[in-house]
Amino acid sequence: MLYASTALSLACLELLVHVSADQSPLDFVYTTAVIPMDPAVHDFHGTLRDAESTRRYGQSWAASLTSLAIYVPSVIIPAESNVLVNPVHDAFQDVVWDAPRLFEFDPRLLRGSSAVL
């Protein structure tokens, strides 16, 4: 399964929630892709907030091979979407990739914060 986001900023947040304060994400690259809309890109319209039900749904969708990609709401920002892309789907070969580009995190994102939201 290939995990992607509809925006680079969301991809950054999705990564940062998994980085502890003593870790520093290094050597990251990003790319953009054009995903063919046929066969249909699936759009998930449910709510899966717990990790286990989300995992089961994703595994079932991937095994079904009904679509190349599925848009799913971000748990961090539910109004925005992540995209799961199934690399074993026949249409995966039709995805057009840009050249990878270096991504550097702004150091302010990686320091501890005492701000109260």
Regions found by a protein language model. Name each.
Residues M1-E14, H18, L84-V88:
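Extended catalytic/binding region for NAD+/ADP-ribose chemistry, centered on the ART fold
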Residues Q23-L117:
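Active-site and NAD+-binding cores of ADP-ribose-processing enzymes
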